[in-house]
Swiss-Prot record:
<dbReference type="GO" id="GO:0016020">
    <property type="term" value="C:membrane"/>
</dbReference>
<keyword id="KW-0735">Signal-anchor</keyword>
<feature type="topological domain" description="Lumenal">
    <location>
        <begin position="102"/>
        <end position="561"/>
    </location>
</feature>
<keyword id="KW-0333">Golgi apparatus</keyword>
<keyword id="KW-1133">Transmembrane helix</keyword>
<comment type="subunit">
    <text>Homodimer; disulfide-linked (Potential). The relevance of homodimerization is however unsure. May interact with phosphorylated proteins in resting B-cells, including HCK.</text>
</comment>
<feature type="glycosylation site" description="N-linked (GlcNAc...) asparagine">
    <location>
        <position position="364"/>
    </location>
</feature>
<dbReference type="InterPro" id="IPR052654">
    <property type="entry name" value="CS_Sulfotransferase"/>
</dbReference>
<comment type="function">
    <text>It also transfers sulfate to a unique non-reducing terminal sequence, GalNAc(4SO4)-GlcA(2SO4)-GalNAc(6SO4), to yield a highly sulfated structure similar to the structure found in thrombomodulin chondroitin sulfate.</text>
</comment>
<feature type="binding site">
    <location>
        <position position="400"/>
    </location>
    <ligand>
        <name>3'-phosphoadenylyl sulfate</name>
    </ligand>
</feature>
<dbReference type="GO" id="GO:0050656">
    <property type="term" value="F:3'-phosphoadenosine 5'-phosphosulfate binding"/>
</dbReference>
<keyword id="KW-0812">Transmembrane</keyword>
<feature type="transmembrane region" description="Helical; Signal-anchor for type II membrane protein">
    <location>
        <begin position="81"/>
        <end position="101"/>
    </location>
</feature>
<keyword id="KW-0808">Transferase</keyword>
<keyword id="KW-0325">Glycoprotein</keyword>
<feature type="binding site">
    <location>
        <position position="392"/>
    </location>
    <ligand>
        <name>3'-phosphoadenylyl sulfate</name>
    </ligand>
</feature>
<comment type="similarity">
    <text>Belongs to the sulfotransferase 1 family.</text>
</comment>
Length: 561
């Protein structure tokens, strides 16, 4: 017998253990006539007449195609509503993610991320219209942030207690030669005495139709510099020296290097310094040859390419070499004197700190520390090189670095999250290895979501001072450069022994707007949260203190910024 599910199943009290099936209107052979539900429910249950337990499973069976017709019509309507609802929900979630508000939709991390603003950095201004909004947000999340601080502070304390600024073991010259046989065969031990830059003549065996830049890797992999090399190619044959039926080209290395650091104003310094008539830079502002290209690295995550030979690097200085050659070949003493004052510079901001390639090429490490560093090779060829370093409060440097290199979902929350993750990774390394081993650890550096290690200036500077004299360095602060450009540039001129500028030249150099400033869309994001700033200040404090001690200048402790 068939009965309607809405009105025909009744259970007696537990003690009776019986199930009675009676329709209120009596049994009906056709459930369409059920007086209670009027046939609106087409799902039928077939219940045996046997005694059943309360949790017994009822068997569901279809009772002919006519019974499913209404159900399918009902299901199609619901199904359309469900699909439409899913589409709306997907669009809402996508808008949250794209707007950077996805933190509320995701499972929270071990630390809570909220927001309230810190003071904007010295060089990067903030949009005033966003201040009230950031202030309101900070009030909401302040308690959550402060709850996280003790846990993060334990990580920082763990790192701090393991910091040791040890003296590195210097490699022998013969060991360096074994690593770079070709480079040592190309660059001579002595340079021309009447040139301020390290230059020498080498024989050119090609004909006047030979393209000297045909295989240059910088030309092959970078289209924007091809026009520069086209001009060099056309003028090449006219700048050769000829003697005894042979042809010679002048080769030069930089007289000085701007070696670091990233997001510390090196581009601005480069742009101003290149306005001086006695300064000639490489054809490319940042060749990154010493740290990356000579190992075949363009982007480390993309793997290794063919190594750029030293000849490709030397080609970048041909424009300056042509002018120096003119001076050396000039007939008048005045012309010789003018051209011989030219100095060559190079401004790769990776030179000071980036030694990530060593793990791929040097297998004789000591306790995880690299056996050779970039400065070892530069010193082997240029023991008298001049080195300029521009530094910045490492806390602000890191945030500027994050805003510049992060591609999407940038926010103060995301930055805070990445900082805490990087600190945890750095601590894990410090538990097993020395400070130097962790700073130069390629695996760690690639794993950290922000480049925490770049701000450890004291570690890098001490390693550079292990091979170069302190007098060969000019260490500048971006904060000082921003407040008094003229004073900073005069210090650079004096350090490089450059001649004075005319009033017009100096005005052009000092009044030009800052280069490579923060992008408007990044300024609109506002500053990092104060608790993030506090965490980073705690982390960098011992490194800044050591730097200030080495330089005998408390300004490099960044206590008041």
């Amino acid at each position: 017998m068939r009965h309607c599910i809405n009105c025909c199943i009744q259970l007696l009290p537990d003690g009776a253990h019986k199930q009675q099936v009676n329709c209120q209107g009596g049994p009906h052979h056709g459930h369409q006539a059920c007086p209670t539900c009027k046939g609106e429910n087409k799902i039928l249950f077939r219940v045996d007449s046997k005694q059943m337990n309360l949790l017994a499973v009822l068997e569901v069976r279809t009772e002919g195609n006519e019974n499913w017709g209404g159900f399918l019509r009902f299901k199609k309507g619901k199904r359309c509503s469900l699909v439409f609802g899913l589409i709306i929900m997907t669009l809402v979630m996508a808008s949250y993610i794209l707007s950077g508000a996805h933190q509320e939709l995701l499972i929270s991390s071990p630390f809570h991320y909220g927001g309230f603003p810190s003071n904007p950095s010295l060089m990067d201004s903030e949009n005033p219209s966003d201040t009230k909004e950031h202030h309101h947000q900070s009030s909401v999340n302040n308690i959550s942030y402060m709850k996280d601080y003790p846990s993060i502070k334990l990580i920082i304390n763990s790192i701090t207690t393991r910091i040791e600024f040890t003296t590195r073991q210097l490699p022998d010259l013969e060991d360096l030669k074994k690593q770079e046989l070709h480079m040592f065969s190309v660059i001579p031990n002595k340079f021309l005495p009447n040139s301020k830059s390290p230059c020498w003549y080498e024989e050119f065996s090609g004909q006047n139709t030979t393209d000297p830049y045909l295989t240059n890797s910088y030309v092959l992999y970078s289209k924007r510099f091809r026009s520069t090399f086209d001009a060099l190619r056309k003028a090449f044959w006219g700048h050769l020296a000829h003697a005894h039926g042979k042809h010679f080209r002048l080769r030069c290395l930089p007289h000085f290097y701007i070696i670091g650091q990233p997001k510390c104003g090196t581009t601005d310094l480069y742009d101003r310094l290149r306005l001086h008539p006695e300064v000639k830079f490489s054809a490319i502002k940042e060749p990154h040859w010493w740290t990356r290209k000579r190992f075949g690295i363009v982007r480390l995550r993309d793997g290794l390419r063919d190594r750029y030979p030293v000849e490709d690097y030397l080609d970048l200085f041909d424009l300056a070499a042509h002018q120096i050659h003119q001076g050396l070949q000039a007939s008048s003493a005045k012309e010789q004197s003018k051209m011989n004052t030219i100095i060559i510079g190079e401004a790769s901001a990776s030179t000071m700190w980036d030694n990530n390639a060593w793990t791929f090429f040097y297998d004789n490490s000591t306790d995880g520390e690299p056996p050779f560093l970039t400065q070892d090779f530069i010193h082997a060829f240029q023991p008298n090189a001049r080195l300029i370093v521009m530094l910045r409060d490492p806390v602000e440097r890191l945030y500027s670095d994050y805003l510049y290199f992060a591609s999407s979902n940038k926010s103060a929350d995301d930055f805070h999250e990445k900082v805490t993750e990087a600190l945890q990774l750095f601590e894990n390394c410090m538990l097993d290895y020395s400070l130097r081993a962790c700073v130069y650890n390629n695996t760690l550096n690639n794993a950290m979501p922000v480049r925490l290690q770049v701000g450890l200036y004291a570690v890098y500077l001490l390693d550079w001072l292990s091979v170069f004299d302190k007098q060969q360095f000019l260490i500048l602060r971006l904060e000082d450069h921003a407040s008094n450009v003229k004073y900073t540039m005069h210090k650079v001129f004096q350090f490089l022994n450059l001649g004075p500028l005319s009033e017009k030249q100096e005005a052009l150099m000092t009044k030009s707007p800052a280069s490579n400033a923060r992008r408007p869309e990044d300024r609109n994001l506002g500053p990092m949260w104060p608790i993030t700033q506090k965490i980073l200040r705690d982390f960098y404090r011992p490194f800044n203190a050591r730097l200030a001690q080495v330089l005998a200048d408390e300004a490099f402790a960044w206590k008041t910024t």
